[in-house]
Amino acid sequence: MTNDNTKNVVVSSRVRLARNAAKIPFPQKGITVEEVAYLVKCADKAADFEHQLVFMSDLRDVDRQALVERHLISPDLAKKDLGALLISDDDSIAVMINEEDHIRAQCIKNGFRLQECYNAIDRYDDNLSKVMDVAYDSEFGYLTACLT
């Protein structure tokens, strides 16, 4: 019997979550520039890591496609001008603003590092809940536009 370690290789780990502001309609229902500005402000305040804030309206199509290919934004956000991306300096944490949900945060790290990813996103979520009233229902939990 041979020991085939190729079956045990983990290329990357990802943890992500979606959060919505309690008093702002989901993006599919229509959202104003002022509401997106509020979400950007909250997302930025919640970040306790070095990061850049990029507005989708400032990006060329080729830059948007590069971010999609690097799994930092979704194809849906790439099509929008009214949205933003907050990205950590090491590219491990990306926060999409005004995608399917108001805030879509993710952490991606190489290898099998789910706990590290979870810890980073959990900390961000804790910080976000301090600066934004998050849409939550006692029966259904966090309210989201997308159940995945």
Regions found by a protein language model. Give the residues of each.
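Long, Pro/Ser/Thr-rich low-complexity/intrinsically disordered regulatory tracts in eukaryotic proteins
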Residues: M1-E139
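Conserved phosphate/anionic-ligand binding catalytic regions in large, soluble enzymes, centered on
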Residues: F140-L147
